[in-house]
Amino acid sequence: MDQLKPLEHMKADSNKAICKNPPNGNDFRNIFQRDRDRIMYSKSFRRLAGKTQVFFAGNDDHLRTRLTHTLEVSQIARTISSQLGLDLDLTEAIALGHDIGHAPFGHVGERVLNYFSNGCELYKGFNYREKTDSIVVNGVEILPIEFMGYKHNWQSVRIAVDLTRHRGKQGLDLSRNTIFGILYHTALSYGKCPHISAGYCKLRERSKERKCGNPIFHLDYYTNNYGEYQDLRYYSVESSVVALSDEIAQRHHDIEDGIRASLISEAELRLKLMDFIKLSTSEIPEEKHTFSNDKEDFITILSGLFVNFYVSKTITYLTEQFGQRKYKNIEELILNPDLDTVMKNIEIYKVVEGDEQLHRFLKERILSSHMAQVMDGRADFLIRRLFKAYI
């Protein structure tokens, strides 16, 4: 008899999954397989090919788009779930759908759209009206709170539930487990606005009236219309696997793209990596200590080393968190009144010691680099011009 894998007892059960119209007898697939296929064949998924990450896709044919990132997240997540004994179909469905609502131009696109929808910048005909019960900012009335906010994970849910049509019907009719995983792959809200200082908005430095009448980034449109999908009864360990895989993929492609764009030298990264992963320990096979002088060979070897290290740490961490000594099955975990706290403990910086320092290094050298800032500035400009053109 084959030995059970570490978290096979926590595997999500497709037979217990809930959606509006379950698969009928003529469908060869279970509900999670159907979720995966519907996402994969949707227009929203195909559009990911035209959405870039940190750099514009046209800058280099080998730099990533949101689609290639999604496929990498799926591959990493499937590897982890396979080793743990979790449901591969649910894992893949969540991974393929997690970014279908993402803005173009990466997180700068998301940031600008959120500013617009929160009235941080005013465009008549779009985000402010006259004679309404809306919030007053700088003497003009902006959108009511119930229409405010943009965040890509919430938008992904909106696309899956409402905006996409399938066979003439509204929405993809995905299972609650898949939608939950898509929603919870990142934070549900923004932190404190970084542009407010003593009640004044730094974004309005050239404006006569700089007071901010809306200090909170509202997401009320989403929470009012899609708040039901926050129900913790539909949590799965598979959703945590995808959330961690998303972070792993982001670190991985930041490093690769940074090397290709010459933002980080191979020598510097080699030293940083040696310090971070501690190659002298027995965790990494001895033969992998040798790096090639060829850039592409170096990137290939580095990628395998880096991802394998993170995947190994993730498997170990999740086994410790959800092993049989703690929970008999997923139902027992879901009934745990401290489930929300358990979920918050599944963070990449807790999984991999030193990740916060690595992330800070990558942010300083790549995301905050002159090249990335130029690209972000262009993206910001393009989105603003498009808004003015369409309003």
Language-model region placement:
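Active-site-flanking alpha-helical
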Residues: 105-109, 113, 253
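Histidine-centered, transition-metal-coordinating active-site segments
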Residues: 1-80, 88, 115, 121-154, ...
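Active-site alpha-helix of zinc metalloproteases
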Residues: 93-94, 242
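Basic, low-complexity intrinsically disordered segments
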Residues: 84
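Short active-site segment of divalent metal-dependent hydrolases/proteases
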Residues: 97-105, 249
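Short, functionally critical alpha-helical segments immediately adjacent to catalytic or ligand/cofactor-binding
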Residues: 38, 94-96
